[in-house]
């Protein structure tokens, strides 16, 4: 399973990338706005830090605008993936970008029928928002299972990128239900390392190590 960071904070990306555990990065306009820097400047720097996919979202909601922005974004680096919202104009854009062999990430997916449409359009990635689905009292994990079954039934190559991951349980369940990859904020990524028994065990080892001669 591939693990992505959902952030535009360069320092956070550098930290996790230094462990050799991050496969890519996802961004959105809200995350980049927090940086106070220009959109393209941030994407270019992120692409220089990680070699894997970096999702950069178009700002327009119209086909012509999305295409113009997408073609500019892919010039930044070879690992840029064009992120588009799951709306009719967005999927029309995905169809055209797919014809040009430009990778895409369809975002804001909240239902299996939406995911089916994205796959038919040729999306490289589909991003179901697990945490936000849970917030509406629906089951975000069931959504992953439904998408996985549909894609397997019909042989779609679109990769399931579980998004809106809030912590280790979301990641574990996404992995068990067949998501190909997952993206999460820096804080959630750091939670993956932690377990109280690990801390207790390490404390005991360190205490015992004081009795040893190196």
Curated annotation (Swiss-Prot):
EC number: 2.2.1.2
Gene Ontology annotations of biological process type: carbohydrate metabolic process; pentose-phosphate shunt
Main localization category: cytoplasm
Residue intervals passing through the bilayer: none
Gene3D superfamilies linked: Aldolase class I (3.20.20.70)
Pfam families: TAL_FSA
Pathway: Carbohydrate degradation; pentose phosphate pathway; D-glyceraldehyde 3-phosphate and beta-D-fructose 6-phosphate from D-ribose 5-phosphate and D-xylulose 5-phosphate (non-oxidative stage): step 2/3
Coiled coil regions, renumbered to chain: none
Record field: catalytic activity: D-sedoheptulose 7-phosphate + D-glyceraldehyde 3-phosphate = D-erythrose 4-phosphate + beta-D-fructose 6-phosphate
Top-level division of the source organism's lineage: Bacteria
Annotated PROSITE patterns: TRANSALDOLASE_1
InterPro entries given in the database record: Aldolase_TIM, TAL/FSA, Transaldolase_3B, Transaldolase_3B/F6P_aldolase, Transaldolase_AS, TSA/FSA_arc/bac
GO CC terms of this entry: cytoplasm
Active-site annotation: 83 (schiff-base intermediate with substrate)
EC category name: transferase
Entry keyword set: Cytoplasm, Pentose shunt, Schiff base, Transferase
Location relative to the cell: Cytoplasm
GO molecular function: aldehyde-lyase activity; transaldolase activity
Cited function: Transaldolase is important for the balance of metabolites in the pentose-phosphate pathway.
Family designation: Belongs to the transaldolase family. Type 3B subfamily.
PANTHER family referenced in this protein's UniProt entry, alphabetically: FRUCTOSE-6-PHOSPHATE ALDOLASE 1-RELATED (PTHR10683:SF40), TRANSALDOLASE (PTHR10683)
Entry protein name: Probable transaldolase
Source species of the chain: Leptospira interrogans serogroup Icterohaemorrhagiae serovar Lai (strain 56601)
